[in-house]
């Protein structure tokens, strides 16, 4: 499915690059693993090739898909106001999907809320994490400049 050198997004971890595909033996069973270098933390993650679909890992979007995300970010409607506990769960679930659109919605909605009132500690952390995940993916989009990333975020 993925090749060495592919830029990917791993939900709740951000973007990374597949550095290798290695065979490892664990409990007497040999398996192929994707070796992924994560952009945010510089950590290395190994995921069995057979579990790649269930992990929701996806390729980094291209610059054309980014224009749609920008529209959602700038002009999309915010979700209805929920009690903070429900809102936190909804936002966390959106980020866990790994979809850039959902992550952008979380950032947009929390930034809009922040303009009206202070965010609580868990919402601040969620906003910070979602922002880091988004920027880590934007940095790997081919054809995008640092100036464009800064203007988007």
Feature annotation, model-predicted:
Residues 1-55:
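A positional/architectural concept
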């Amino acid at each position: 499915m993925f090749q060495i050198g592919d830029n990917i997004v791993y939900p709740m971890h951000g973007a990374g690059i597949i550095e290798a595909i290695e065979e490892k033996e664990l409990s007497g069973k040999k398996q192929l693993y994707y070796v992924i270098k994560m952009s945010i933390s510089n950590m290395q993650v190994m995921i069995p090739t057979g579990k790649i679909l269930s992990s929701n890992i996806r390729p980094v979007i291209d610059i054309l898909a980014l224009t749609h995300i920008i529209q959602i970010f700038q002009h999309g409607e915010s979700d209805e106001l929920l009690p903070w506990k429900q809102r936190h769960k909804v936002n966390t679930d959106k980020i866990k999907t790994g979809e850039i659109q959902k992550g952008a919605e979380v950032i947009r909605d929390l930034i809009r809320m922040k303009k009206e009132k202070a965010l609580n500690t868990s919402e601040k952390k969620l906003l910070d994490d979602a922002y880091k995940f988004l920027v880590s993916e934007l940095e790997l989009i081919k054809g995008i400049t640092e100036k464009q990333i800064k203007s988007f975020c």
